[in-house]
Amino acid sequence: MNSTNFISGVVKILESPKQKIINTNILVTHFRVQFPQVRNSCIVHLKFWGNLAGDVVTYYKINDYILIEGCIALKDKQTRTSNSKMSKKIEITVLKIYPFLLSHDRSMIAISDW
């Protein structure tokens, strides 16, 4: 059973996006991000669908900060421990994305292209 809610916030990209194609030509991209907090770090999984999935891979890299809007859900995730307990995984299906703070290397390349 999933519980969904709307969420928006700034996150930091932790890993390279992973893409896969499901059904017939539906592109899905997913990767892990972190909310920028001082004391507790909260790592969540983002999922992008369709054209937005392709744009994310093209324009955003590791260590970029992005502003996202989407639906948050708690998914059951079985861990590989000896007692096989079920844990929860936070997953956000992103509907809109905006650049917030891009990494230094890409900013210089973009300026030199002008």
Model regions and ranges:
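Single-stranded nucleic acid-binding surfaces, predominantly the OB-fold ssDNA-binding core
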Residues: 1-114
